Swiss-Prot record:
Function: Forms the portal vertex of the capsid. This portal plays critical roles in head assembly, genome packaging, neck/tail attachment, and genome ejection. The portal protein multimerizes as a single ring-shaped homododecamer arranged around a central channel.
Localisation: Virion
Protein name: Portal protein
Main location: virion
Quaternary structure, from the entry: Homododecamer. Interacts with major capsid protein. Interacts with the tail tube proteins gp11 and gp12. Interacts with the terminase large subunit. Interacts with the internal virion protein gp14.
UniProt lineage: Viruses, Duplodnaviria, Heunggongvirae, Uroviricota, Caudoviricetes
Gene name for this UniProt entry: 8
One of the record's GO cellular component terms: viral portal complex
Natural source organism: Enterobacteria phage T3 (Bacteriophage T3)
Length: 535
């Protein structure tokens, strides 16, 4: 349906590109299926699975519990309820406003308003639900693709693609070259003109027949922008093409662990797959042996006088003729083997509990958690996960903010912001508590400064330098807070002038009072000379 043939990365078409890049993705799919097998199998089903598939439950629950626990803590640290991102002006613009603290405060107030609008948009469109599912996919499969639709209407939730539903190709630096997604949709749900074009090229189809819709986004060499179009049954859909700047592409491929030179990432579970598989086998053996051991079987001497029929019919307290030596119960006598298996299983479970952070119980269950609890979780995540924060901040949080800025500016929901002057910054880890952390920093800084009051009279201490170092250590920008030397001199001169005026007024008032008391006639003459009517 397209009038002109595409060139560059879009030359082969969406379906052909998808089929070609699927071979590179297959190894990552296999690893994701193995990881899901020992955690939550339904998170990454096999290609042959469908809605009616009854997944085999793992013999151990450490994998599933650890996955949900780690995803919840990542969600709390990366996307807290407070603002987890900040809009700041560039360093050059900030230096221009250093001499105008009021102007700098107004700019910061305006940027805070934009932040609140973005956060409200995220909450009202249920982004957190999809983001939590995305984090679970990253832990199991290591890859996920987010799509942020254009703000049309009052509800625009984002869409998540599993690794099995898209392909991606990157350059040597990790930049996205092209992405192809596959959506399955009923033929009757397509627009009428699209159905007509598909039937014209491929024959009639039933209305409930499922067809594949491919969306191809690729980098254009000439313009440097991303071009997008959709394709059904090798037919390009008219009106589906779009152009996106490189910093505002609504298709965001996210990786959990980045490997240099690879288009896809590795999962967190993959790093501990050996322990997960070993624990699964040990738990299966222990459970089966426990079931066998729990089966009670009595043995009776066939040559003895004790009759099993009488024993089974006897009630509690009855007397049955027989000999104790004729009866014995079957035992496996495998306690030593059980002890070894249990010890190894406990060691593996302890390692996995540390890896998935199952040992931390400081976070209570409730609707509201304190900033100290969030700070503890973020600190523990930083110690355990290492560089995961840096990857997610660059591949998930920062692109998300940039896309939302572009989309909300295009729909006039936020004012136009100059790209060269406004820079979005992402807060992760201990800084992910957002604007509430700013208030906490200010309170800590003021408390530390207040503790310096007893040192005012010490001639050996430079309090101005100490105050500045305290602010820098906490992370407070002192522009507009601490007075400069010029501002101090201006205030001192203003205070001196005000004091001089007050002293002169007091002295003049005292002189007039004395004159009026000593000589009323002289007071009247002075008043008449000044043009005043003395009464």
């Amino acid at each position: 349906m397209a009038d002109s043939k595409r060139t560059g990365l879009g030359e082969d078409g969406a379906k052909a590109t998808y089929d070609r890049l699927t071979n590179d993705r297959r190894a990552y799919e296999t690893r994701a299926e193995n990881c899901a097998q020992y955690t939550i199998p339904s998170l990454f089903p096999k290609e042959s699975d469908n809605e009616s598939t009854d997944y085999t439950t793992p013999w151990q629950a450490v994998g599933a519990r650890g996955l949900n626990n780690l995803a919840s803590k990542l969600m709390l640290a990366l996307f807290p309820m407070q603002s987890w991102m900040k809009l700041t002006i560039s360093e050059y613009e900030a230096k221009q406003l250093v001499g105008d603290p009021d102007g700098l405060a107004k700019v910061d107030e305006g940027l805070s308003m934009v932040e609140r609008i973005i956060m409200n948009y995220i909450e009202s469109n249920s982004y957190r639900v999809t983001l939590f599912e995305c984090l679970k996919q990253l832990i199991v499969a290591g890859n996920a693709l987010l799509y942020l639709p254009e703000p049309e209407g009052s509800y625009n939730p984002m869409k998540l693609y599993r690794l099995s539903s898209y392909v991606v190709q990157r350059d040597a630096y990790g930049n996205v070259l092209q992405i192809v997604t596959r959506d399955q949709i009923a033929f009757g749900a397509l627009p009428e003109d699209v159905r007509s074009a598909v039937e014209k090229s491929g024959g009639e189809k039933k209305m409930d027949e499922m067809v594949d819709v491919y969306t191809h986004v690729y980098l254009d060499e000439e313009s440097g922008d991303y071009l997008k179009y959709e394709e059904v049954e090798d037919v390009e859909i008219d009106g589906s093409d779009a152009t996106y700047p490189t910093d505002a592409m609504p298709y965001i491929p996210v990786r959990m662990v980045r490997i240099d030179g690879e288009s896809y990432g590795r999962s967190y579970c993959e790093e501990y797959l050996g322990d997960l598989r070993s624990l699964e086998n040990l738990q299966e053996a222990i459970v089966k042996m426990s079931m066998i051991s729990a089966k009670v079987i009595g043995l009776v001497n066939p040559a003895g006088i004790t009759q099993p029929r009488r024993l089974t019919k006897a009630q509690t307290g009855d007397f049955v003729p027989g000999r104790r030596e004729d009866i014995d119960f079957l035992q496996l006598e495998k306690q030593a083997d059980f002890t070894v298996a249990k010890a190894v299983s406990d060691q593996i479970e302890a390692r996995l509990s540390y890896a998935f952070m199952l040992n931390s119980a400081v976070q209570r269950t409730g609707e509201r958690v304190t900033a100290e609890e969030i700070r503890y979780v973020a600190s523990e995540l930083e110690d355990t996960l290492g560089g995961v924060y840096s990857i997610l901040s660059q591949e998930l949080q920062l692109p998300l903010v940039r896309v939302l800025l572009k989309q909300l500016q295009a729909t006039s929901q936020i004012p136009e912001l100059p790209k060269e002057a406004v820079e979005p910054t992402i807060s992760t880890g201990l800084e992910a508590i957002g604007r509430g952390q700013d208030l906490d920093k200010l309170e800590r800084c003021i408390s530390a400064w207040a503790a310096l009051a007893p040192m005012q009279g010490d001639p050996d201490i430079n309090l101005a330098v100490i105050k500045l170092r305290i602010a820098n250590a906490i992370g407070i920008d002192t522009s507009g807070i601490l007075l400069t030397d010029e501002q101090k001199q201006a205030l001192m001169m203003q205070d001196a002038a005000q004091t001089g005026v007050e002293n002169a007024a007091a002295a003049g008032g005292a002189g007039v009072g004395a004159l009026a008391t000593s000589s009323p006639e002289a007071m009247q003459g002075a008043a008449a000379k000044a043009g005043l009517n003395a009464t």
